[in-house]
């Protein structure tokens, strides 16, 4: 049908015009953890979008951040949109099944990373500008220990 023909032509033109983004695969693996859940009988899964690097089945990783201790584990499964994979690359949204990790040991905001590639920091210096109410910013003040 005519619509299908033009639709395919349009998408071919778009594919030619817009370059495919390059994936940052040469740097060490790192994935911010967006969600954590348990699969009964299998274990704990950390999900998120891989920021850089490649992760493969059997790779050792560290869970870093928000707690003092770094937790070491092994990736025993990788899934993307209910498809089992042998590896995940930068840009992929995956779930990584983690060996010997309890659900309570992993939280959103931590990072799954290649061993020794990420360090945590407890303090940093910053200069912050807070927009006024008139500028479209906050209407109420910040209080001590604001999170």
From Swiss-Prot:
Its main location: cytoplasm. Gene3D superfamilies: Translation factors. GO terms for molecular function: GTP binding; translation elongation factor activity. It comes from the Bacteria. SUPFAM superfamilies: EF-Tu/eEF-1alpha/eIF2-gamma C-terminal domain (SSF50465), Translation proteins (SSF50447). Signal peptide: none annotated. It holds the Pfam family GTP_EFTU_D2. Keywords: Cytoplasm, Elongation factor, GTP-binding, Nucleotide-binding, Protein biosynthesis. It is found in: Cytoplasm. Induction: By elevated hydrostatic pressure. InterPro entries: EF-Tu_GTPase, EFTu-like_2, EFTU_2, Transl_B-barrel_sf, Transl_elong_EF1A/Init_IF2_C, Transl_elong_EFTu/EF1A_C. GO terms for cellular component: cytosol. Monomer. Belongs to the GTP-binding elongation factor family. EF-Tu/EF-1A subfamily. This protein promotes the GTP-dependent binding of aminoacyl-tRNA to the A-site of ribosomes during protein biosynthesis. This is Elongation factor Tu. The gene is tuf.
């Amino acid at each position: 049908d005519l619509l299908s023909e033009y639709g395919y032509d349009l998408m071919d033109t778009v594919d030619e015009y817009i370059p495919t983004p390059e994936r940052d695969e040469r740097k060490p693996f790192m994935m911010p953890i967006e969600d954590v859940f348990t699969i009964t009988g299998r274990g704990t899964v950390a999900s998120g979008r891989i920021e850089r690097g490649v992760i493969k089945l059997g790779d050792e990783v560290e869970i870093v951040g928000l707690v003092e201790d770094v937790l070491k584990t092994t990736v025993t499964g990788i899934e993307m949109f209910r498809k089992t994979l042998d590896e995940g690359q930068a840009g992929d949204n995956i779930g990584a099944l983690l060996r010997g990790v309890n659900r309570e040991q992993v939280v959103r905001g931590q990072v799954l990373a290649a061993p020794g590639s990420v360090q945590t920091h407890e303090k940093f210096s910053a200069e912050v500008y807070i927009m006024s109410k008139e500028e479209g910013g906050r209407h109420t003040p910040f209080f001590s220990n604001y999170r």
